[in-house]
Amino acid sequence: MVYYDLNIDSSLPEPKIKSMLSLHTKYGYDSVAITHTVEGKIGYKDVCKIKKIQIEDDSEKSTSSGWMKMGDSNKTIKQYTRLQVICKTMAEFQMITANNPVVQSYDIISVVPYDVSVFNAACNSNEIDIITIDTFSKFIIKPERVRQCIAKGIFIEILYGNLFGIDADRIAFFQIASSLVRSSFGKNIILSSSGKSSTTLRSPYDLSNLGHLFGLTFDQAKAAVSKHPHTAVLHAITRRTKGIATVTDPNLLKDLELWKLERKEDTQPTNNNIPHEKHINKESTGKETIPKPTTTTTTTTTTTTTAKTKTPTPTPTTEKTPSIPTQPPQKPTAKSNKKTTTNTTSTAQKQGKMDIDIDNNKRKRE
């Protein structure tokens, strides 16, 4: 694992920079960037004058694990040059172009936006590699702009050196860091020291634990000091050479090819048309079939009746014969229950009267 710190101030005296580089090697860092900061518009006086510092003592031996041990590895620390421009207006930001010789003289280009318009323009720019969010950036960061920045391959840098300052800087650091993590979901975030004092420098493992305080997972915090800075350096190489470069180190060529493949996978669609398992019905035969949508159709039928008119046909005239009138057949009518009950009661009364009359006649005869 390769660890990076991409922000060491170049305005410090050379002995102090040398002591800081030796401390970086003790903590396990493999690469650093010495930064030249410009406030406002850049000019010819800002052409890169940074020289690589030679460390001759035994402290240049670093560790591969990131712990403070000496003499376990013979790796020498790599040094990159970086231009950091503090932009307050769009006129200052528009000076950063690929045709500018000042920009071409540095390995990495970064911007510190102090205005929301500069930040929005930087998220859609092809001329920079890193956007540094400082505690002086007093504007609201929108998630849409952060995701646009990620799609462009630009990284957002957070300086953890502000934690060791006053309370206001500490509060502003956690507010900015937590909002960036929520907007980017932990992608394309770089953690760097301010590079002004050796007391603010921390090891990569300390930074991995620090990332938990503002929402990063352990892997994301570890990538913020290893994978993401490494990808930013590769992005700077392709930006400077416009995709065509002569690479003498085969390991760097391998990293460039892997980075291009990762970028292609992130930007191109996957063309994955296979549905999820929960959307697939498994029949008894064991085959998987995609359920077809069922549609119900309702049909309505209408019937129309047409009245047929019969034309009268002429009948021959014949002599009339007297005919016997016939009564029309009477249709049987259904009697109700009330009528049947009244009929039965009337017949019973009649039979009772007849019985009384018969008894009276017998008595008279006697």
Swiss-Prot record:
One of its GO terms (cellular component) is nucleolar ribonuclease P complex. It is an enzyme of class 3 (hydrolase). It comes from the Eukaryota. Residues 265-366 are annotated as: Disordered. Its EC number is 3.1.26.5. Residues 275-290, 352-366 have a biased composition (Basic and acidic residues). Belongs to the eukaryotic/archaeal RNase P protein component 3 family. This is Ribonuclease P protein subunit drpp30. It comes from Dictyostelium discoideum (Social amoeba). The lineage of its organism: Eukaryota, Amoebozoa, Evosea, Eumycetozoa, Dictyostelia. The gene is drpp30.
